[in-house]
């Protein structure tokens, strides 16, 4: 069953944590789409699991726009938030609205000025 029991997060190293500081930070974090921005870390869900990424781990963040062209229909776009560490993309979060990705990028820059945006 999903959602039952204690909140647990996986870090960039895929190790699980469940300390009270991160649980409280997650619950108080600002939600934008499928992501949350807390004071301690950036949180997101992927395939039913919750992940946390400390802001100092993120070297670069940017938006990638993907186009989908169905047969005999107009094209539609979806937006991806890409997070990079050590030259490798480690998170690829899909959003339907560009405004959500733009808002996250703005707030990431405010929370951690060392993150390269774009």
Predicted regions and their residues:
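Anionic N-terminal interaction surfaces
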Residues: 1-39
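Acidic, Ser/Thr- and proline-rich intrinsically disordered linker/docking segments
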Residues: 2-4, 60-118
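Generic preference for well-ordered secondary structure
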Residues: 21, 26, 37, 42-45, ...
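Short strand-coil-strand connectors
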Residues: 31, 45-49, 86
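Residue-level detector of beta-strand structural context in well-folded domains
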Residues: 32-33, 40, 51, 81
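Phosphoinositide-binding peripheral membrane targeting modules
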Residues: 38-70
């Amino acid at each position: 069953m999903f959602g039952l029991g204690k909140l647990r997060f996986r870090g960039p190293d895929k190790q699980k944590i469940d300390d009270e500081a991160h649980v409280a930070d997650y619950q108080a974090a600002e939600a934008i789409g499928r992501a949350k921005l807390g004071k301690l870390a950036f949180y997101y869900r992927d395939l039913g699991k919750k992940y946390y990424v400390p802001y100092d781990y993120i070297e670069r963040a940017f938006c990638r726009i993907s186009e989908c062209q169905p047969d005999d229909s107009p094209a539609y776009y979806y937006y991806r938030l890409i997070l990079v560490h050590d030259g490798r993309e480690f998170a690829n979060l899909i959003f339907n609205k560009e405004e959500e990705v733009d808002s996250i990028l703005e707030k990431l820059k405010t929370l951690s000025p060392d993150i390269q945006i774009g």
